[in-house]
């Protein structure tokens, strides 16, 4: 049976760290991100699933009279993120060797617009939370992915353990992506080991 390797975008294919955004939010609000973190996290899935836009998100998190730039998420993403071209080339080599590759990523509608989709044309599967109206780590997204892929042999690489833990419940193999493990060659080795 064909093996399928799915990759997250932000924090994996795209160099990204959530702390960059939290620092920008702290700077604009002139108060620690920790003060709004629970409300922020409680509403993030609605943003990822296109149930609300960035403006509505901030009105819910901070109230209607907030002072934050309501495009802070997409602006920070555009300003700070970059493509990991070395990893992207490695991923494309997996496809050249007969494997199927895909993307499973949480994106806001606004950050989705920041991504050069032509860079991702070679991917066989595209699962974007804002398009399919489901987000990680909610179980329904993994159920949906498994039903869309005609293989029971799926590997998922993500930078958040909670997303991987949920994937494991659907018999998806997982690898936690960290920059150190990538720089040392461990991520590519684990993927190669999975394929052999």
Model-flagged regions — what are they?
Residues 88-96, 146, 168:
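Surface-exposed amphipathic alpha-helices with a cationic face
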Residues 108, 113-196:
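Asp-based, Mg2+/Mn2+-dependent phosphohydrolase catalytic module
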Residues 1, 96-99, 148-152:
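Glycine-rich phosphate-binding loop signature in dinucleotide/nucleotide-binding domains
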Residues 8-11, 50, 103, 126, ...:
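Generic structural signal for small/hydrophobic residues in well-ordered secondary structure
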């Amino acid at each position: 049976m064909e093996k399928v390797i799915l990759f997250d975008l932000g924090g994996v294919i795209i160099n990204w760290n959530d702390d960059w955004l939290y620092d920008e939010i702290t700077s604009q609000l002139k108060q620690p991100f920790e003060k709004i973190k629970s409300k922020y996290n409680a509403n993030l899935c609605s943003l990822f699933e296109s149930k609300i836009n960035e403006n509505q998100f901030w009105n819910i998190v901070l109230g209607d009279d907030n002072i934050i730039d309501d495009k802070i998420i997409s602006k920070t993403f555009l300003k700070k993120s970059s493509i990991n071209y070395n990893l992207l080339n490695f991923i494309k080599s997996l496809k050249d060797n007969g494997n199927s590759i895909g993307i499973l990523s949480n994106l806001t509608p606004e950050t989705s617009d920041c991504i050069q989709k032509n860079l991702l044309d070679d991917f066989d599967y595209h699962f974007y939370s804002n398009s399919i109206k489901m987000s990680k780590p909610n179980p329904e997204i993994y159920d949906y992915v498994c039903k869309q892929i005609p293989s029971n042999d799926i590997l998922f690489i993500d930078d958040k353990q909670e997303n991987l833990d949920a994937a494991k419940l659907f018999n998806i193999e997982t690898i936690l992506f960290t920059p150190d493990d990538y720089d040392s060659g461990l991520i590519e080795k684990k993927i190669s080991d999975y394929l052999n």
